[in-house]
Structures are given as C-alpha cells and as structure tokens.
Amino acid sequence: MSTAIASARLQALNAGSAASTHLAECLAVDFAALLQAVAPTLPPAAIQRMRAAAGKGITQRMALAAALLREAGQGDVQHWQAHSSDTVRGWACYLIGADAQATLADKLQAMRPLADDPHFGVREWAWLALRSDIVAGPLEALALLQPWAQQPSLHLRRFACEALRPRGVWATHIALFKQQPEHVLPLLETLADDPERYVQDSVGNWLNDAGKNQPDWVRTVCKKWQSTRDSVANAYIRKRALRSL
C-alpha cells in the first residue's frame, strides 16, 4: 500500500489544521513550517534552529520544539494541548516533561489528559516525554502508575504499562526492569485479563521485552498464568509475550 501523502494533505498537516491519521503522516510533518504556522511570533532564529534540526530523529525534534516555545515565553501547556494538530499536542507533552521545577508526580498529573488523548500519536508522546524521569526513578514511577492500571480508561491503563516497558520503542531502556522485571509483576497482574486488545498488546510487549534479558522469568510467569487464568485475553497476552523466546 502506498504511503504517498497528497500535497494538499501535507499542507494541512504543516499548517496545524489537520491531525495525522497514521505514522507516515506523523513522520512527514515539517516541524519548522508547523512551528511557524502555530506560533507566528517566534523569532526567526528559533524557526531556523528547527529547520537545521530537520535531519535529527523525531523525538529530538519534539523536545526541541517544546524548548523553543518555552524559551520564547510561549510554553503554556494548556494552550498547546487544546490544539487541533496532534504534533502540537505532542509538543505540550514535551513541555510538561521538560519542566525542571515539577516532580514526577506533578508531571504525571499534568500529563493525564494527554495520556488519555483520542489521538494515538499524542498518547505515545505522553509517555515518551516522561521517559527520562521514569528511567531516573523507575520504582517511584511504578508506585505512581500502579493506580493508573485500575482506571476505567483503557488509554490510561495502557499508559501505566507502556511507560514502564524495559525497552520500548524510540526509548531509553530501564536497566532495573531489564534485570529485575519482577518489580513490575503486581502491575502486570492487574492487567493480565484486561478486556481491551490495546492494553493486551502492551502487556504482551512488556513481557516480551523482559524476555530478552530474563526469558526464564517470563516463561515462569506465563506458565503460572496458564494454570491460574483461563481468559481469552490472557491467552493472547501469553502468546504475544512468548513470541521469539
């Protein structure tokens, strides 16, 4: 299937008047053009810095956009998190994540509506923007996120698991959970029969991550679950967890 994006569609994405519908569109956004469109009073030097960063990875450019907005006195999270562009709402995530005065608990509270955003991309930026804090204090993050695993919102339940993945996608690894994944077992147990496939995928991926360093532990957990849990959801999670192990 072709991933070519029509010119008019790309213009709308770069103007901030449309949200992306798939990953290829997310990656195709011209950050300098979007920044200039949504924050027209930014100094030209700021736009040039973003233009010069065009070849960098997308997570680096997300963080840079937030930094440029903050430096220009335009770092109002509430303003940006209400924007129609999912990329701009992602910048709001990075504004929260880069707040040096906020504790992790404060950041998680501020991030909550973005972690529950209707757009798939914003929900990913929400945990990626906090990843450095989580890596720096994984047990604190685990304690703070345990209650999220019991929330009515499937997005928040998934966030609780995805944010703590030992490896993750586009993310710094969490060394403690790679070597001692048992710390997270109570949270995984909470989600072990989750009815939503979106959450099941995250739990299965979490265990598969852990299995790259601790395969015997993952096999033991799955064997126990096989004998104590008979849900279709858990069977799916176990299959996903054990793939490639």
Language model: regions and residue ranges:
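Surface-facing alpha-helical segments and adjacent helix-coil boundary elements at the starts of domains
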Residues: 1-245
